[in-house]
Amino acid sequence: MKRRIFTLSGILIGALTTLVSSPALALYEQARWFTLDNGMDVIVIENHRAPAVHARVVYKVGALDEAPGQFGIAHVLEHMMFRGSPAYHGRGLLPGQYDGELGRIGATDNASTSANVTSYYALMGSEHLELFIEMNAILMNGLTADSDQLENEKGVVLQEFRQRWENNPTARASHAMRAALRGASAYDHPIIGYEEDFLGLTSQDLLDFHADWYQPNNAALIVSGDVTPEDVLALARKHFGDFPAGDVPERIRPDAERAFEPGFETVTDALITKASARRAWRLPEVVAETGPEAFRSRYAARLLTSMLTSGLDAPFTRYLQTERQIALSAGFSIVLDEGQDWAMLNVDPVEGMDAVEVLDEAEDFLRNWLANDLTEDRLNRQKRRLMNGLVYAADSVDGPAGSFASLVASQSDYGVYLTLEDTIAGVTLDDVREIAALFLEQASQPRTLALEPLEE
């Protein structure tokens, strides 16, 4: 097939052009990006340290793409993909055959559904990569959607729903807080969906959803490990190349539809085993784009929170857990998510302490620390920790595949990895102070959530 040429960050790149030039992330220098004629992305990261590969097929569809009345369909479809597929290139899959064949060769496989993507992935010996690619091409071609199999999988999903959602008041309350922070109704439902919705799904519903979204031009094959780009491209062309590009529905990402409502809420439930509290603030928009400048701001926020909370010597840990001994754990995060930006503080108090009182003291310490104790030395230490973590992840079989899958999920420019080390190194103390000022000076009034066990 004819190779396409793309312009990325002002550099003309072809199918065999290096994506990452950072010496600290040497393995990312092996990353190659191809696009088949039908629009399917193929990303390959070479790592010949061990004769193994991590491969995943990522579809750009998730819970945010579901229609009202069908909440949970992306997750149910993920389950049903392993329950039989019609023949493609002369071969189909029986129920359980996908997992069975991967298990037979010693592979470990799984699948996951998120707000933005659905992924199918496996870790295996590199000599078995074609089997994974071949079977995932069969999955892309279609599913049997047998009604009896569907009813069985609904039962499995219902058990998950009861464990993760219905019988988990902490998860429900936390999800509601995050949905309120985002401000758009599309975030209100959990990824697993609602019982009345997923139990009402039909085989035709799943077939229609698959036909809409499981298209080559809405998918990426990502392979990391003991492979060559040329070999992976040949396998991708062999098994995925005959699919025509499809008409994929427009993905609508919701803007905030409602104002953030500050306030205080207490959730008391017999299923809550220990008290905790969290407090959240809506922040003004920092960056809406998904390119390198957005990554710079996000890494500034990440470095800021790491300076405060990472490690046993972290100021937050030392003050709340060692000096005051009032919390078992505590955390603070700032999330910059394309205009839906927020901060959250959470504490788990020691037994006998009031969770909200501990939360108040944690906030007082946080504000004082952000205003007075940000230093160049602390920033540089966290930069080194962050870079070390990225290097260690890059030197694993699955780490690079996960990194590129995250870019697919966020629809970010693949070029952000061209200058990743420079982006992190270039974060200044002023950048970090600017993020801190968002919280200290421009945040909304907070919303506080207290979770308490039901007293007998």
Where are these regions (language model features)?
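Non-catalytic, conformational "gating/processing" segments within enzyme and secreted inhibitor domains
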Residues: 154, 206-239, 444-445
